């Protein structure tokens, strides 16, 4: 990773987004995308709010980041997130991992593993698959406990509400 980033700082920013999702009854996943040392996109899961199964935090943030880069006159990359780092509280699923590869994101830093749907090393490893035309650098476990506890609290609350 060429730019030295403060991974804990940016993961705390992603955790703020995850808490917004939690407060709105969404699975608490938060994302920030960093380019040139600054946050250019931030998002949280909005699947329930938007009634859209693709409205994962990563997908929303990728669109925001591409729009931001285009607004800055970065026309030649056409949505490419080269030199961008994405901070996610939960290991991305197959859909989001595929989108990160297609967006040519450089670095993925995530909090806690998703043993049931993780596609960045846990269940699959889409982001580092040699058969694809792009691979991401991956750092896992940044503020993992905070991410894990937030997710556990969400599902405990959900189970209580169903009783």
Kindly give the residue locations of the regions a language model identified:
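Short beta-strand scaffold segments in enzyme catalytic cores
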Residues: 29-37
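Short metal-coordination and nucleic-acid-contact micro-motifs, chiefly zinc-binding Cys/His arrays
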Residues: 89
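A short, polar/charged loop-to-alpha-helix boundary motif
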Residues: 49-60
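Zinc-dependent deaminase
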Residues: 1-22, 36, 72-82, 92-163
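Histidine-centered active-site/metal-ligand motif
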Residues: 44, 56, 134
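Small-residue (primarily alanine) positions within well-ordered alpha-helices
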Residues: 14, 18-21, 31, 41, ...
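Short beta->alpha transition motifs characteristic of CBS
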Residues: 40-47
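Short loop/turn microsegments at loop-to-beta-strand junctions
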Residues: 27-29, 84
């Amino acid at each position: 990773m060429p730019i030295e980033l403060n991974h804990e700082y940016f993961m705390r920013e992603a955790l703020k987004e995850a808490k917004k999702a939690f407060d709105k009854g969404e699975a608490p996943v938060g994302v920030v995308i960093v380019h040139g040392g600054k946050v250019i996109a931030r998002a949280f899961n909005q699947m329930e709010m938007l009634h859209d199964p693709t409205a994962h935090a990563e997908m929303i943030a990728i669109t925001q980041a591409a729009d931001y880069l285009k607004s800055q006159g970065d026309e030649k990359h056409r949505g490419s997130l080269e030199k961008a780092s994405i901070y996610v509280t939960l290991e991305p699923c197959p859909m989001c991992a595929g989108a990160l590869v297609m967006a040519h994101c450089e670095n993925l830093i995530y909090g806690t593993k998703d043993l049931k749907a993780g596609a960045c090393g846990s269940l699959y490893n889409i982001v580092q698959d040699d058969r694809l035309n792009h691979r991401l650098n991956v750092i896992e476990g940044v503020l993992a406990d905070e991410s894990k506890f937030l997710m556990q609290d969400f599902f405990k609350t959900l189970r209580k509400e169903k009783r």
